[in-house]
Design a protein with these regions (language model features):
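Secreted/periplasmic proteins
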Residues: 5-10, 14, 18-170
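N-terminal secretory signal peptides that target proteins for export/translocation
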Residues: 1-3
């Protein structure tokens, strides 16, 4: 009887130790597992930051996007996390950009996903300057948390602060 209870305690201790090690490894990978799990559903939720290769700083990405378009700070556009590029139409050179509905802070905007790779760890999306000003008008926050990004099917969306699809309201 003592042997069985000792074995049970030992088994529980080993299970706990393995769980702690696995949790630490997930944290060390920068939330990649959490993002991958969220990507299996229709929408992903996480944090957003801003990028602009024309502003000084270490986060310069260059004037061209992954789709081959030139970066335009006045467009309603964003860069999706590299590991999620398949969910958002591939985002590759020469391909038509895809669109997403972005919701945060009680606001919504349709953005063109034409680039990849938020350079800041832990972010799921990087907004260009115009999109970030929609969610953070004074650019004071730097990061917008609780951003919900839903891929939109089709390519007839009009980017901007609305839910309209070329005259049709979904």
């Amino acid at each position: 009887m003592v042997f069985r209870s000792s074995a049970a305690i030992c088994g529980a201790a080993i299970t706990l130790a393995v769980s702690v090690v696995m949790a630490r490894s997930e944290i060390d990978r920068g939330h990649s597992n959490a993002v991958a799990k969220a990507a299996s559903g229709a929408a992903i939720v996480g944090a957003a930051s801003m990028y602009n290769p024309y502003r000084p700083g270490w986060q310069e990405g260059g004037p061209n996007t992954a789709s081959g378009e030139r970066y335009d700070p006045s467009a309603w556009a964003a860069a999706i996390q590299t590991s999620l590029r398949g969910k958002f139409g591939g985002v590759r050179y020469g391909a038509s950009p895809k669109y997403a509905l972005v919701e945060a802070a009680g606001k919504k905007a349709i953005v063109k996903i034409n680039d990849v790779g938020p350079l800041t760890p832990g972010r799921i999306i990087d907004f260009n300057e115009r999109t970030m000003r929609h969610f953070d008008p004074g650019l004071r926050l730097g990061v917008v948390y609780g951003v919900k990004v839903t891929p939109l099917s089709g390519d007839d969306w009009t980017p901007g602060p609305s839910d309209r699809r070329r005259g049709r309201v979904p």
